[in-house]
């Protein structure tokens, strides 16, 4: 779903463990790493989209996690000009994201990157909460920084 400003409505997921680490996933057959994220379909709430993406991308269900927090506002990033698909309509210029902080309740052996026909990720690891800000692709860094600042107290108090 793309809004009137050309932003695709999207959810992002920060999954933390009991040690204050966050799940960091490598995109399938690529060198880039990121948090799980995905689009909101027409008729879906952000929470419904988050649970769908959680299963599609890392194989977890609602019973495997607990929602600790949701960002107060939507965060946006623009795609670099060379990544915009100019011939595809409606035109998507970037993402408008609502972020969820989830606590993993199950064992991390339940994480499964191969639950969908099309894999988003091929591997994952636990990392310190600030690591992703320095490692994510440059045009997402400002969003990651804002999200982590909003979630930091909840992550380190686990």
Swiss-Prot record:
Family that this chain belongs to: Belongs to the Nudix hydrolase family. RppH subfamily.
EC assignment: 3.6.1.-
Nudix hydrolase domain ranges (all copies): 6-149
Top class in the EC scheme: hydrolase
Motif (Nudix box): 38-59
InterPro entries associated with the record: Nudix_hydrolase, NUDIX_hydrolase-like_dom_sf, NUDIX_hydrolase_CS, NUDIX_hydrolase_dom, RppH
GO molecular function annotation: mRNA 5'-diphosphatase activity
Taxonomic source organism: Blochmanniella floridana
Domain of life of the source: Bacteria
Keywords: Hydrolase
Stated name of the protein: RNA pyrophosphohydrolase
GO biological process: mRNA catabolic process
């Amino acid at each position: 779903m793309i809004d009137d400003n050309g932003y695709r409505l999207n959810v992002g997921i920060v999954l933390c463990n009991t040690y204050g680490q966050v799940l960091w996933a490598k995109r399938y057959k690529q060198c880039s790493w990121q948090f799980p994220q995905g689009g909101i379909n027409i008729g879906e709430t952000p929470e419904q989209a988050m649970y769908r993406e959680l299963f599609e991308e890392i194989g977890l269900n609602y019973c495997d996690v607990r929602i600790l927090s949701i960002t107060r506002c939507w965060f946006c990033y623009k795609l670099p000009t060379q990544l915009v698909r100019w011939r595809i309509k409606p035109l998507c210029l970037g993402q408008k994201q609502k972020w969820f902080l989830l606590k993993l309740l199950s064992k991390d052996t339940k994480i499964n990157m191969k639950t969908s026909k099309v894999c988003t990720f091929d591997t994952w690891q636990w990392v310190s909460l600030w690591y992703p800000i320095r490692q994510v692709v440059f045009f997402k860094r400002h969003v990651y920084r804002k999200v982590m600042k909003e979630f930091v107290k909840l992550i380190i108090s686990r």
